[in-house]
């Protein structure tokens, strides 16, 4: 028990990507502070390639991100699968639907994040498979910019479920679950191979996994 206490005390530098950090942290920070009161958490936000470089150099202890090919060089601990929902403006022809078939996106142009965001690449993959394309007139710097562009009637987009509000419709945006297939990304905790603090990261991952268990079932039910 004393060893566990030592493992979960002291400073911990955690990196998070911008499309995860602001949306996941409110769910987990109070729980982590209560569960591991002696842990001093320092949070760093950057894009995937920057975080992995800082993890490799030792500037960061661990990183929470959407698992990608580049993270395979590290120890990956999957936390949860996060669905993506279609965000459309409130007077869009699909606004009263309960869900959207991915095949329905064929021929549509979707708003996307700018280069460097892994969510951009993942969303583009799902869109291309469905026969959709990118709206090349605009690339957003953040999910909030994307959301506001949708509210303004400038287009539609895929948003990760953590960024979706509890209501199916809010501030001029309607959120619809996508099916056949359901687009999603795997969020994981990543750390350096051979790290002496492996136990710390595994305990952290287990606590986050338990906290988020079943969370997206509720989100998708509310969206319908």
What positions do the PLM features span?
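Flexible hinge/capping segments at coil-to-helix
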Residues: 71-84, 88-110
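Alpha-helical linker/hinge and terminal dimerization helices associated
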Residues: 1-5, 204
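C-terminal effector-binding regulatory domain of bacterial HTH transcription factors
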Residues: 161-170, 180-224
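Short, well-ordered beta-strand segments
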Residues: 11-15, 63, 87, 111, ...
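Central regulatory/effector-binding core of bacterial HTH transcription factors
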Residues: 9-72, 140-142
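Hydrophobic hinge/microswitch elements
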Residues: 47-60, 65-66, 114-174
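Secondary-structure junction motif
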Residues: 94, 109-130, 197-206, 211-221
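Short secondary-structure boundary/capping segments
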Residues: 4-6, 33, 75-78, 94, ...
């Amino acid at each position: 028990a004393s060893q566990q206490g030592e493992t979960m005390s002291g400073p911990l530098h955690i990196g998070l990507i911008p499309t995860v950090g602001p949306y996941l942290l409110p769910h987990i920070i109070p729980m982590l502070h209560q569960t591991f009161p002696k842990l001093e958490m320092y949070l760093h936000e950057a894009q995937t390639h920057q975080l992995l470089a800082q993890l490799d150099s030792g500037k960061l202890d661990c990183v929470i991100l959407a698992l990608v090919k580049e993270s395979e060089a590290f120890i990956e601990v999957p936390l949860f699968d996060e669905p993506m929902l279609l965000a459309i403006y409130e007077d869009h022809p699909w606004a009263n639907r309960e869900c959207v078939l991915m095949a329905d996106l064929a021929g549509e142009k979707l708003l996307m994040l700018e280069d460097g965001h892994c969510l951009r690449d993942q969303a583009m993959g799902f869109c291309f498979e469905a026969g959709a394309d990118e709206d090349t007139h605009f690339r957003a710097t953040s999910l909030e910019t994307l959301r506001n562009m949708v509210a303004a009637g400038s287009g539609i987009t895929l948003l990760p479920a953590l960024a979706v509000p509890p209501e199916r419709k809010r501030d001029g945006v309607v959120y619809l679950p996508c099916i056949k297939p359901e687009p999603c990304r795997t969020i994981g905790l990543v750390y350096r191979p051979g790290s002496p603090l492996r136990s710390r990261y595994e305990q952290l991952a287990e606590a986050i996994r338990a906290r988020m268990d079943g969370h997206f079932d509720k989100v998708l039910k509310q969206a319908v």
